[in-house]
Structures are given as structure tokens and as C-alpha cells.
């Protein structure tokens, strides 16, 4: 039999093992896995390379429309492809207007036409002002709903994102549970974090360590505990976003042991950066929850290897450089990171700490696809989309600003020596990024809607 594509001689990450085996693709799908698969129009030799499922990044901010000067579909999805991401799940905030109903999500679809290098699923927003319109987003096909119990949004802009209070969260979660949807939550105690931050500013405490102290671990843990209880009472699946502390992970683990339907994610920056590095890097490493100390980081690695964290995500949330000016307490909080999720974590988790390749595949792709119902994504298996990434192990390089595809070529990882490289990214059987030839085909990404799964 003749196929469109055969990948030969690579070490392939399968669900429960990794071994040297060939992959055949036909019509954008994985058609066969094995040896001596026959002929193909295109044959790629992956000798010495790891062949991974394309990353499913379940937490990405593309600020188009309305704030395209922060990040746009063209630049953001090219960076994703260069970093081995083949599917992103896009957050409903940072763009203007926020994605809170049918009209605003249609604006996203229109803005992205002809610009998607990778595939994209959408999240709707659960905000203080759209409880009567959640069904519109469900009908369009979002794969989940994001909300904040921490303070968010520009109060001077009417159609910006807004956090929810406990009543709004509970009522929204009730509605979403009835729709068989998942609610995703940014968990920090709004009032305490706000007051601690204002107190620090008044007293002139504006260093990285001061910022971290203004958002202590207990503010994350309290919020996680609260939304777990409310989501359970409301009858809604819960996904806890970007957990930064082992104590926060323990709350999720405890709830799972009590048979609550809950999952969680974390981000590479919580595993590879610490507060001292944050102080050195400056505002480019500011995010919330904040990057914490080495002892906290050690605990996060233990939770990751124990299987208590479901997936790793970028939380890519860039902004124009001028918004990172000034002291750390004043600067915008958000990290530009999606281009370096896979290579950094392959280096740190697999090469330096001995994580198995199947576990790496689950954390970067499989689990996120399962959590959000992306049935064609996240696995190297017959019938799945042929979304694949070639990783060259033990191949060190120093990340430079000019390597970045973002609209603004800045990242807290610039200057870092990374011990692995993404050499090729394949989306539905077509090479969309190659380390030698760049981006060889026009953007072919498409939106993934829940009801089409």
C-alpha cells in the first residue's frame, strides 16, 4: 500500500511505551504503525530523534482582535509550531472584546482567517456579566469555560474580562454542569492578594521577592479549596489552572480521592525558574500565581513525577515591552513561553531527571486532549490526526531573541542553554515547521469545535 507520508527509524512515544518503529499517514490521519509499511509519497528519516505527539497546549492567550499589538494569530501560532505545539486551547481573555457570547467568539473566528499555523480550540468566558449567555458559547462549540476568582480585567474598559464572586461562580458552574462543560479557574484569593499588593506598593516594597510575598501560597490554596467545594455543590467538572504550589496540588489530589471530577495543570516556569532567578530576569518573569522559591519548586517536581498534575501548559500571556517597564509591582503579569514548552521540559524532565517518554507524552499532549474532549488529538495511534514532533535529544543551544517568532521577541528563557531541539513539526500529515527550512507551507490550521468531535 502507498501512503502520503512514512516516518522511519524514530523512537516513537506511544501510549505506554517508546520504541523505534515506523509511522504511516494518509489523508492527515495516522494510518499504520509498524515495520515495513510500504511506499509513500514523502518519507522522513527520524533516526536518532524522538517522535512525540504534537503538544496540546491547553492554556494560550492570543490577544486578537483588539490587542493584536500584544500578540496575534500569525505570530503566536508560528511560535507554537516552532515549539512543537500542534493544537492550542485559547483563553477567552486579553483580546477585546472578551469572548463571552456568540457575537464575540465569531469575532475571534473572523480575526484568525488565514493566519492559523496550528489547530485551535476555544474556551468561553464565565464572567460577572454573561450568566445569561453561557449557552451561546456552548452551542458554538467551546471546549470549556474559563473564570477568575482573582481580580482581573481593566475596569476602565467595558468589554474586558471580569472576575466572578462566589455567587456568580456557583450559578455559572450550575449552568455549565447542565451543559456537560468544564469550568477552568484561576485560583487566588482576590481580596487578600489585592490588599497585600497595595500595602507593598505603599511601603515601597517593589522587588521580585516582594511581589511573591504579596501572593503567598495560602492565597492559592484557599481559592482552590473554595472552588473545589463550590464546583462539587454545583455539579460541574473543574479544571484548576496553572497551579504553582505543591500544597495547591494536594487539594486537587484530596478531592480526587473523594471521587470529585477535577483535573489540574501547571507550567514549565514553575519547574525551571525560582524567585532568585525572577529577581535577576526582572519583569519578563512576572506572572500570577508567581514563581516561587527553590523548596516550593522541589515539591512541584515531586508532584509532577507522582502523577498528581495532569498536564503542562504554557500560559503564554505576552504584552508590549512598554507594559513590562518600571518595577515589578507595576509591570504587567504574564510570561511569553509557548515556543519553549517542549524543548525546555524535555531537557529538564526527561534528560536531567529521568522522566519516561510515555509520561512526557501524556503531560504534553494526551491528558490535555482527553480532558477537553479533543478526540482526534494527543496520541500517536491509528485514526488520530497525524500531529507529530521531532525532538533532537542532547542537542544544546542558547536561546536568543532573534530565535523567537512572537510579535515581541522577548522571553524569560532568552539566554538559557536548552539541551534539546525541536527539529520538525507535523500537522495532520504536513510539515508546518522545519528547523532548516522554516515554515514550508501556508497556514493550514483550523478551529476545533466541541460538537464536531
Swiss-Prot record:
Its EC number is 3.5.2.5. Keywords: Hydrolase, Metal-binding, Purine metabolism, Zinc. Pfam families: Amidohydro_1. One of its GO terms (molecular function) is cobalt ion binding. It catalyses: (S)-allantoin + H2O = allantoate + H(+). GO terms for biological process: allantoin catabolic process; purine nucleobase catabolic process. PANTHER family: ALLANTOINASE. Belongs to the metallo-dependent hydrolases superfamily. Allantoinase family. Catalyzes the conversion of allantoin (5-ureidohydantoin) to allantoic acid by hydrolytic cleavage of the five-member hydantoin ring. Homotetramer. NCBIfam families: allantoinase, PRK08044.1. This is Allantoinase. It comes from Salmonella gallinarum (strain 287/91 / NCTC 13346). The gene is allB.
Amino acid at each position: 500500500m502507498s501512503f502520503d507520508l512514512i516516518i522511519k527509524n524514530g523512537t516513537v512515544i506511544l501510549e505506554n511505551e517508546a520504541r523505534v518503529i515506523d509511522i504511516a499517514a494518509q489523508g492527515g490521519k495516522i494510518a499504520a504503525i509498524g515495520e515495513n509499511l510500504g511506499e509513500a509519497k514523502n518519507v522522513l528519516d527520524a533516526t536518532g530523534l524522538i517522535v512525540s505527539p504534537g503538544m496540546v497546549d491547553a492554556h494560550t492567550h492570543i490577544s486578537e482582535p483588539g490587542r493584536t499589538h500584544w500578540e496575534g494569530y500569525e505570530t503566536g501560532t508560528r511560535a507554537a509550531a516552532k515549539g512543537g505545539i500542534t493544537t492550542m486551547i485559547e483563553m477567552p481573555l486579553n483580546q477585546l472584546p472578551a469572548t463571552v457570547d456568540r457575537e464575540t467568539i465569531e469575532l475571534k473566528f473572523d480575526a484568525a482567517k488565514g493566519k492559523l499555523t496550528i489547530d485551535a480550540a476555544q474556551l468561553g468566558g464565565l464572567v460577572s456579566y454573561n450568566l445569561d449567555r453561557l449557552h451561546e458559547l456552548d452551542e458554538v462549540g467551546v471546549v470549556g469555560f474559563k473564570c477568575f476568582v482573582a481580580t482581573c480585567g481593566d475596569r476602565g474598559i467595558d468589554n474586558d474580562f471580569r472576575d466572578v464572586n462566589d455567587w456568580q461562580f456557583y450559578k455559572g458552574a450550575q449552568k455549565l454542569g447542565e451543559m456537560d462543560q468544564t469550568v477552568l479557574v484561576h485560583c487566588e484569593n482576590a481580596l487578600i492578594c489585592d490588599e497585600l499588593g497595595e500595602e507593598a506598593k505603599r511601603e515601597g516594597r517593589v522587588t521580585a521577592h516582594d511581589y511573591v510575598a504579596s501572593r503567598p501560597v495560602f492565597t492559592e490554596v484557599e481559592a482552590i479549596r473554595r472552588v473545589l467545594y463550590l464546583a462539587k455543590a454545583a455539579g460541574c467538572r473543574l479544571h484548576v489552572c496553572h497551579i504553582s504550589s505543591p500544597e495547591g496540588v494536594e487539594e486537587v489530589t484530596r478531592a480526587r480521592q473523594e471521587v470529585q471530577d477535577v483535573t489540574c495543570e501547571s507550567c514549565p516556569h514553575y519547574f525551571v525558574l525560582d524567585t532568585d532567578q525572577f529577581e535577576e530576569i526582572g519583569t519578563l518573569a512576572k506572572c500570577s500565581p508567581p514563581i516561587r522559591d527553590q523548596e516550593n519548586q522541589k515539591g512541584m517536581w515531586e508532584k509532577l513525577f507522582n502523577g498528581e498534575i495532569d498536564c503542562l501548559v504554557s500560559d503564554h500571556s505576552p504584552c508590549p515591552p512598554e507594559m513590562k517597564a518600571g518595577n515589578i509591582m507595576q509591570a504587567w503579569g504574564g510570561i511569553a513561553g509557548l515556543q519553549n514548552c517542549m524543548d525546555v521540559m524535555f531537557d529538564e524532565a526527561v534528560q536531567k531527571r529521568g522522566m519516561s517518554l510515555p509520561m512526557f507524552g501524556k503531560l504534553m499532549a494526551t491528558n490535555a486532549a482527553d480532558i477537553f474532549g479533543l478526540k482526534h488529538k494527543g496520541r500517536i495511534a491509528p485514526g488520530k490526526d497525524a500531529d507529530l514532533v521531532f525532538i533532537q535529544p542532547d542537542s544544546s543551544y542558547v536561546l536568543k531573541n532573534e530565535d523567537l517568532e512572537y510579535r515581541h521577541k522577548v522571553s524569560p528563557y532568552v539566554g538559557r542553554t536548552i539541551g534539546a531541539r525541536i527539529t520538525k513539526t507535523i500537522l495532520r500529515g504536513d510539515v508546518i515547521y522545519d528547523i532548516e527550512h522554516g515554515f514550508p507551507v501556508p497556514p493550514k490550521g483550523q478551529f476545533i469545535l466541541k460538537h464536531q468531535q
